[in-house]
């Protein structure tokens, strides 16, 4: 386990002090009481069954997008296009949710999830091939594909998949395709457990299997750099690792989108927005690019995000201010979070 010096602890507390001071100034400038805002933030994220359930719901896609991020980073590919995979995964999972009939619940849900994951993976195939065989930066290509995904799903929701004569949306998915909601009056559903299982499985595969070792060897160090010199020394083709890593990353993005449609909104509509892909990049880094760390960081961030909604409802403080300040607090807590992750991993 890594040793933590007094300097690490000092930097952590200094960061907490500075971010607390900034938060106090920002909140006071809006004419609100910082203590009251902190109380609402805590209540919205951590107090009461419904609020906790909603916090877990907010954490669900973050666990998957953070895991998708860390896998691509570990193979040396900087995938910024997870949002695009979420969009196409959500669209086609929603389509499969009403298109296929006469299926049992488990079969229908599984089919929808597999379709969402497959489409999400295929969405990342082009930037992976462009990077490996043409040297095109995956950062640029995946960012472009994010915009292409938005335009594509908008076209499909307005055209071939449109079922609502008023709004650009698909038909509602069948009950056999729905993920079960755990608590009434909450969007928390069984998708959370799927996300946690997937992240734990990713941890096992990356750290305990030969396949995971070959993937990790595709990058130089924790954050990979493609092509990897280390991989070539071992005789492992880094090209293959890069492509497979991008496909897995896209599949997890598609899974996150599929769970959102199957477990919460129940259909795909044009105004559906996904920003969890970008959040997943920050959370994946905060979790030290380890799946277990991604789970922990996602739970914290999900609670803060839900608490931000509660603060926005109760006060005049913008939710964006709360999330920005809270994320900075999480960054200040990075040393302690790293310690928790190391304790769980060893």
How should each PLM-predicted stretch be described?
Residues 101, 183-267, 291-292:
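Helix-loop-helix "hairpin" substructures at the membrane interface of multi-pass membrane proteins
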Residues 11-27:
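N-terminal signal-anchor transmembrane alpha helix
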Residues 246-324:
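Transmembrane alpha-helical segments in multi-pass inner-membrane proteins
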Residues 328-335:
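Conserved small/polar residues in nucleotide/adenosyl-binding loops
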Residues 25-30, 40, 45-100, 113, ...:
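Single transmembrane alpha-helix segments in multi-pass membrane proteins
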Residues 1-14, 331, 342:
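Transmembrane alpha-helical segments of polytopic membrane transport and secretion proteins
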Residues 49, 138, 142-208, 319:
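Transmembrane helix-bundle core of multi-pass membrane transporters
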Residues 2-10, 73-81, 103-106, 110-168, ...:
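Short loop segments and helix-boundary regions at transmembrane helix junctions
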């Amino acid at each position: 386990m890594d040793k933590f010096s007094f300097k690490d602890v000092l930097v952590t507390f200094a960061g907490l002090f500075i971010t607390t001071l900034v938060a106090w100034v920002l909140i006071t400038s809006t004419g609100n009481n910082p203590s009251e805002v902190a109380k609402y933030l805590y209540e919205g994220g951590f107090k009461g069954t419904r609020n906790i359930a909603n916090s877990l719901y907010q954490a669900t896609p973050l666990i998957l997008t953070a895991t998708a991020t860390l896998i691509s980073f570990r193979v040396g590919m900087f995938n910024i296009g997870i949002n695009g995979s979420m969009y196409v995964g959500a669209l086609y999972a929603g389509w499969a949710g009403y298109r296929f009939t006469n299926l049992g619940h488990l079969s229908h849900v599984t089919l929808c999830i597999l379709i969402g994951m497959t489409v999400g993976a295929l969405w990342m195939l082009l930037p992976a091939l462009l990077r490996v065989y043409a040297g095109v930066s995956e950062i640029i290509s995946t960012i472009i594909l994010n915009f292409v995904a938005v335009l594509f799903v908008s076209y499909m929701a307005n055209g071939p998949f449109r079922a609502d004569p008023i709004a650009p949306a698909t038909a509602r998915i069948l009950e056999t395709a729905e993920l079960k909601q755990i608590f009434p009056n909450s969007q928390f559903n069984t998708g959370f457990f799927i996300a946690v299982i997937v992240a734990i499985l990713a941890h096992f595969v990356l750290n305990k299997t030969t396949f995971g070792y070959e993937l990790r060897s595709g990058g130089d160090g924790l954050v990979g750099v493609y092509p990897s010199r280390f991989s070539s020394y071992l005789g492992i083709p880094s090209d293959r690792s890069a492509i497979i890593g991008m496909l897995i990353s896209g599949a997890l993005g598609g899974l996150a989108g599929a769970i959102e449609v199957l477990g919460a909104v129940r259909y795909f509509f044009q105004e559906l927005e996904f920003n969890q892909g970008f959040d997943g990049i920050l959370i994946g880094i905060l979790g030290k690019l380890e799946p277990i760390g991604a789970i922990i960081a996602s739970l914290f961030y999900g609670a803060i995000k839900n608490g931000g909604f509660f603060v926005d409802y109760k006060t005049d403080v913008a939710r964006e201010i709360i999330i920005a300040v809270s994320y900075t607090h999480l960054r200040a807590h990075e040393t302690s979070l790293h310690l928790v992750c190391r304790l769980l991993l060893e």
